[in-house]
């Protein structure tokens, strides 16, 4: 089911989950300009080209945020690793529903996986961390 939110300009946006709805409200509450699913990145799984659509782009900071309720399997986790390898200057961060939840088919949590792969992350409940991210000095040019 689609969830409806308004961006900072009052434009109605349909997002895909409650997590994305909550994240949109946090970004709007912090009065940071954001776009939803406007950034698309092509990436290659050996011998095949795929497209990944980022959930939230913060253009003036160069930050991309993916809201994840659940990292379902190795294939999905591999997608983010390939994106990181193929876009080394990209600042992709994760907001998880629960950082301590085990990744599908693995014996480690979402947070452990993100740390191991070098991604910044937090829980949707970590409003202050998201706020800190958005107050960082931009390295984006």
Q: Residue locations for each model-derived region?
A:
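Nucleic-acid endo/exonuclease domains
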Residues: 1-141
């Amino acid at each position: 089911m689609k969830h409806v939110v308004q961006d900072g300009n009052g434009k109605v946006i349909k997002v895909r989950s409650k997590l994305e709805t909550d994240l949109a409200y946090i970004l709007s509450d912090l009065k940071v300009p954001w776009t939803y699913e406007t950034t698309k990145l092509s990436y290659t799984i050996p011998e095949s080209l795929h497209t990944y659509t980022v959930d939230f782009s913060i253009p003036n900071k160069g930050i991309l945020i993916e809201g994840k309720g659940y990292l379902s399997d190795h294939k999905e986790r591999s997608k983010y690793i390939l994106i990181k390898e193929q876009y080394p200057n990209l600042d992709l961060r994760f907001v998880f529903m629960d950082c301590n939840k085990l990744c599908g088919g693995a014996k480690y949590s979402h947070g452990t996986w993100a740390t191991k792969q070098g991604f910044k992350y937090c829980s949707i409940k970590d409003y202050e961390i998201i706020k800190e991210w958005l107050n960082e000095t931009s390295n984006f040019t």
